[in-house]
Design a protein with these regions (language model features):
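Alpha-helical elements of the RecA-like P-loop NTPase motor core of helicases
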Residues: 4, 74, 123
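Hydrophobic alpha-helical positions that pack around
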Residues: 9-117, 129
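Short, internal active-site loops enriched in acidic
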Residues: 27-28, 146-148
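A structural signal for short secondary-structure junctions
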Residues: 94-95, 107, 134-135, 168-173
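Short amphipathic, charge-patterned alpha-helical segments
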Residues: 118-133
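Short loop-to-beta-strand transition segments
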Residues: 130-145
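A structural-propensity feature for long, helix-poor, extended segments
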Residues: 147-174
């Protein structure tokens, strides 16, 4: 990179960070819902409100507010760099792109992983996670956070995408 390019990027980063505010919310699970989140940031009780209006119409401090999961924002630079055709070429036609999973618990390889949508649970646990510790048998996994669901050994070949998981009563969390 040229010095001029690096200086340009640093100025952009400085401009972005000078407008960034970090707010500690109430921490309640319900504050993941958009209207509850905006209420919490405003110093009010983090309770979901009746819609309409939606947050894109009237959100934070009464102004239109776009709320997305940090994972969504993390995908933007690569989509801008490579284009939408590149991004939609990853994953499945119905669930394009990648998904981050926190691989934790009784597997050999733990960590945050990013995989194409449509990968199977078996591939995540055994190929990436290295299988169950101490050669023990797989029993079940909780997916998608508190409301995501539990999958058993008979569901190891389930595809990790929105439609496939919905069909078996589970969901991918944020």
């Amino acid at each position: 990179f040229s010095l001029r390019y690096v200086q340009f990027e640093l100025r952009l980063l400085h401009d972005l960070l000078s407008h960034l505010h970090i707010n500690r919310g109430a921490g309640a699970f319900v504050c993941g819902e958009g209207s509850a989140l905006t209420a919490s940031i405003e110093g009010k009780r983090g309770m979901p409100r009746v819609k309409p209006p939606r947050t894109v119409e009237k959100g934070l401090f009464g102004k239109p507010t776009v709320l997305n999961n940090v994972e969504t924002y993390a995908n933007v630079p690569m989509i801008v760099k490579h284009g939408t055709d590149w991004y939609t070429g990853i994953g499945t036609p119905e669930s394009p792109g990648t998904k981050a999973f926190a691989l934790t618990g009784n597997v050999n390889n733990t960590g945050l992983i990013e995989v194409p949508m449509g990968i199977t649970l078996r591939e995540i646990i055994f190929d990436i996670g290295g299988g169950i510790r101490d050669g023990k048998k797989f029993k079940a996994v909780q997916i998608g956070g508190p409301s995501g669901g539990c999958l058993t050994e008979s569901q190891l070949d389930s595809k990790m995408d929105f439609d496939s998981l919905t069909k078996i009563g589970a969901m991918i969390g944020s």
